[in-house]
């Protein structure tokens, strides 16, 4: 039986990321930010009231409300208020062709995100902001450094109750930005590629694998040489308003050449952005990749793809959660996260081609949940204690965390994999047989090998994301040419970054 988690983000904005720290900003030496707390800070009694604010209700609300009640029970005399703002998505479950399905349909709301950011800015200026902020839509480049976020370096260094090696350390290294750590993710995600061993010759496939990052351009070059018209190169549609598509993949891998948040200089008009748009359209028109649809049709298209796949693709892109299927597919259980913009393909001969890298070779991660502390909070001690509580193994194993990312906590990541496999195989008492245990151990080892390559968190700005996504719709809808879109984006981004 296959369990498909369908995420159809109708009109969903691509998560554009625009500034990468590839691990060169270290904690030690002259780069260390000034210490914000001393050792006495951690002896304070955990008490009083704090507020946690997030935009995305689906990712945060249930989890935070559970955490708030548990934290209050652990620390009598505390109160944790939870604020979330976006509408909850429509969730439907069912069965199709023997496959269990869960379809999550979200309406994108650029204006809602903009209103939320404006509200946060107003609250911060008036001194009435929350104590903790989820970093789901807030622009880190505007909030870090001299902005309203607390530098957490000294908290992690001086707190005797915080153990850095409890977490994936290369993720903690990657999030350092402007000589500081301004938020902590609770989880992490990455993309990886597979190749179909029935289509890609062994001599080529042997050069791919878990140890070596690779980007889409490299795989497209390989695929072009092999292409014979019988099968398409990638399982991604040319364009979709959902986060997955060939356009979104190439944009994310190359965004740093189009936009530099540190210098506040956009670069959409040197020809490379327009060339990328035209190449994606050409791939679709030439039949090299599937051609997509837009708008509300995405949801229906996704439902059609939830059945048993009938097509093969030279290469496929997946997120980290789907990696489980690589090791359970021969045991009668698979779990794929099928997102809008993805075409389902036969995967019985798939082998791992590598973790996805940016065009410059850096290997990024994303996160589902992450939090920063308001530097003007009146109760930083309790805010920090709550953030540590969210990072604990117990909370990272909560059933209210969406299973779309890997826990940052090392013990939680190990245990969550075990629980997921036991649940997938419906074993009584959570005991796996030898074959299932081998699959679990192979999966865990592969997760860690791929994760070892991560060295970059690429800072994003949702307002710029929405600008780019809006103009891309005009191009793929046929109402504007690539050069016109590039010029408009150059002007819009330049105006926004100069504010």
Question: Residue ranges of each PLM-predicted region?
Answer:
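Short amphipathic alpha-helical coupling segments at ligand-binding clamshell hinges
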Residues: 63, 67, 378-390, 485
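C-terminal capping/gating helix-and-loop segments adjacent to ligand/active sites or protein-protein/ligand interfaces
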Residues: 365, 423-497
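Helix-loop-helix "hinge/cap" segment bordering the ligand-binding cleft or interdomain interface
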Residues: 153-163, 172-245, 253-295, 375-381
